[in-house]
């Protein structure tokens, strides 16, 4: 989802 995508970019 949108939130999941944002978190993924931050935790990369």
UniProtKB/Swiss-Prot annotation:
What does the record list as coiled-coil region(s)? Answer: none
Which cofactors, by name? heme b; Ca(2+)
Q: Does the keyword S-adenosyl-L-methionine apply?
A: no
Record's keyword terms, sorted: Calcium, Heme, Hydrogen peroxide, Iron, Metal-binding, Oxidoreductase, Peroxidase, Secreted
The cofactor remark states: Binds 1 heme b (iron(II)-protoporphyrin IX) group per subunit.
Q: Where in the cell is it found?
A: Secreted
Q: Which reaction does it catalyse?
A: 2 a phenolic donor + H2O2 = 2 a phenolic radical donor + 2 H2O
Q: What's one GO-annotated cellular component?
A: extracellular region
UniProt EC number: 1.11.1.7
Keyword Oxidoreductase assigned: yes
> Of which family is this protein a member?
Belongs to the peroxidase family. Classical plant (class III) peroxidase subfamily.
Q: What is this protein called?
A: Suberization-associated anionic peroxidase 2
């Amino acid at each position: 989802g949108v939130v999941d995508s944002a978190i993924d970019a931050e935790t990369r």
